[in-house]
Design a protein with these regions (language model features):
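A short glycine-rich, Lys/Arg-flanked "PGG" loop and its adjoining helix->strand segment in the class I
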Residues: 11-23
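A short helix->loop->beta-strand "cap" motif at the edges of active sites that frequently abuts
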Residues: 23-25, 145-146
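Class I S-adenosylmethionine-dependent transferase superfamily signal
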Residues: 17-18, 44, 138
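A short SAM/SAH-binding and catalytic strip from SAM-dependent methyltransferases
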Residues: 1-8
């Protein structure tokens, strides 16, 4: 997987690779220079303790062999925790770094919620659910909704979306069909 631009997500990915590769194994990453390759390489060096680098055609490849002696266990644990869902905004929602608009409500979603009809009912779908903001707001505004199907290309978004839906349902004291 190519390291993402979002720094906390990239650090968590480097930590996951460091934790899963066998001693003596090699971890490699490639990033475009205009996609954060310099900071990606610096973070890679921090977690692995060293790196070899090749830069060509506006890209950078960096790799390192692994050894227990080069890892800082505290840093490894800290960076692994960066991918965990965390409270955002006023604390009503949880999300995780790297998701679209992960720590805010994006303007398009805010516009949709502002114009959401209150008479929605039955089974509804949230296409591109992200961390579940629209689904939760639909539940708050539309008492007739009996089921919600979440569709999201980023699998990492489903855990916070489910947490947010469960929390909203608990606040509203109502169940959904499964």
């Amino acid at each position: 997987r190519v390291p993402p631009r979002q720094r906390d997500e990239a650090r968590a990915l480097f930590a996951r690779a460091a934790a899963h590769v066998a001693p003596g194994g090699i971890v490699a990453a490639a990033m475009a220079n205009d996609e954060g390759a310099r900071s990606g390489e610096a973070d890679f060096r921090k977690i692995f303790g060293h790196a070899q680098v090749m830069s060509k055609c506006h890209c950078r490849v960096f790799w390192a062999s692994t050894s227990a002696e080069t890892f800082d266990p505290a840093l490894l644990a800290d960076w692994q925790a960066l991918d965990a869902p965390r409270a955002i905004g006023d604390g009503r929602y949880v999300s995780r770094p790297g998701l679209f608009a992960w720590n805010r409500v994006d303007p398009a979603s805010a516009l949709l919620v502002a114009h959401l009809p209150t008479q929605l009912c039955g089974r509804v779908a949230d296409l591109g659910a992200g961390y579940g903001y629209l689904a939760c707001e639909a539940l708050r505004r539309c008492a007739g909704i009996t089921a919600i199907d979440l569709y999201e290309a980023e699998a990492r978004a489903l855990q916070p979306a489910r947490i947010n839906l469960d929390s909203t349902l608990q606040q509203l004291d109502r169940p959904l069909e499964t």
